[in-house]
A protein has these predicted regions:
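Aromatic- and carboxylate-lined catalytic core of secreted/periplasmic carbohydrate-active enzymes
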Residues: 13-15, 20, 24-31, 35, ...
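Single conserved hydrophobic/aromatic residue that forms the stacking wall/gate
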Residues: 1-9
Length: 178
C-alpha cells in the first residue's frame, strides 16, 4: 500500500536531504478529459497525500494535467497554509502509529522555522473516526492556539486535540504558543 510505504520513509529526512514520496496523481491524469481519466484517489485521499508530502517536505511534483484542474484540485495544490508548511517544516517525524477504536492512525509533527509547530493526523483505516490526542503526544504543552490548515478552523488553548477524520483522511494543524 502506497501510504504505508510513504509512512515508512519518515527516517529519510535530515540535513541536506529529504524523502521523495513521488509525484502527486491529482486531477485529470491524461489529456483526454472525461471521468475515466481522473485520479482514482478520493478528495480525502488527495488531502492526505498533500498533507503527508508537505509535512515531510517531499518535492511537490504534480502528475495531473494542470489545465484541466477543477476547483477542488486547484485549491488543493494552491492552499497557502499547506504550502507554508511545506516550506517551513523542519525535523518532521512520525510520533506514533497506532490503532484507536479498531482503526489505524498516524501522528506526525514538525517544527516551524517561523515559530510554532505543525501537526498532521492521518486515518489509515477504511472507516471514519473521531479521536482525541493529548497535547503531550503532540510534543507541545499548554498555552497554544492552533489553526487547521485545510479548513481554517481555529483551535484555542486545547487540553487535547479532538479530530474527526474521514476514511483515509488527514487533518493538518499549525500551533503557536500564546
Amino acid at each position: 500500500d502506497r501510504r504505508q510505504r510513504q509512512m515508512c520513509i519518515r527516517d529519510s529526512a535530515g540535513t541536506g536531504h529529504w524523502p521523495d514520496a513521488d509525484m502527486l496523481p491529482v486531477g485529470p491524469i491524461r489529456q483526454v478529459y472525461d471521468v475515466n481519466n481522473w485520479t482514482n484517489f478520493t478528495q480525502d485521499e488527495q488531502i492526505t497525500m498533500l498533507t503527508l508530502w508537505s509535512i515531510m517536505r517531499s518535492p511537490l511534483m504534480l502528475g495531473g494535467e494542470l489545465t484541466g484542474f477543477d476547483e477542488f484540485t486547484m485549491n488543493l495544490v494552491t492552499n497557502s497554509e499547506i504550502l507554508a508548511m511545506h516550506a517551513n517544516a523542519r525535523h518532521s517525524h512520525q510520533v506514533w502509529r497506532r490503532e484507536i477504536d479498531g482503526i489505524e492512525h498516524a501522528l506526525w509533527i514538525a517544527a516551524d522555522t517561523k515559530g510554532g509547530y505543525y501537526v498532521a493526523v492521518f486515518n489509515l483505516g477504511d472507516k471514519d473516526s473521531d479521536i482525541s490526542i493529548p497535547l503531550a503526544d503532540l510534543e507541545i504543552y499548554d498555552g497554544v492556539n492552533g489553526t487547521e490548515l485545510w479548513s481554517g478552523e481555529h483551535v484555542e488553548e486545547p487540553k487535547s486535540l479532538s479530530v474527526s477524520l474521514k476514511s483515509h483522511g488527514a487533518r493538518a494543524y499549525h500551533f503557536t504558543y500564546n
